[in-house]
């Protein structure tokens, strides 16, 4: 059987932790930051965990990271 390819777009966007969680960056931290509060900007720094309904899709795109 041939090797499975990793989706490079998914590899750039998601990070798999040692415990198996799949994390992503939160949207809204690129521009127009002056109108956002400091606490909101800090909250956007914390990575989010993907939803369970989307997990199988990401797992198929990252075959060797899990």
Swiss-Prot record:
UniProt keyword list: Ribonucleoprotein, Ribosomal protein
One Pfam match: Ribosomal_L35p
GO cellular component: cytosolic large ribosomal subunit
GO molecular function annotations of the record: structural constituent of ribosome
GO biological process assignments: translation
PROSITE patterns, alphabetized: RIBOSOMAL_L35
Annotated stretches, region: Disordered: 1-43
Residue stretches of biased makeup (Basic residues): 1-15, 22-43
Cross-referenced PANTHER family: 54S RIBOSOMAL PROTEIN BL35M, LARGE RIBOSOMAL SUBUNIT PROTEIN BL35M
NCBIfam families associated with the record: rpmI_bact
Similarity comment text for this entry: Belongs to the bacterial ribosomal protein bL35 family.
Listed name of the protein: Large ribosomal subunit protein bL35
Gene it is expressed from: rpmI
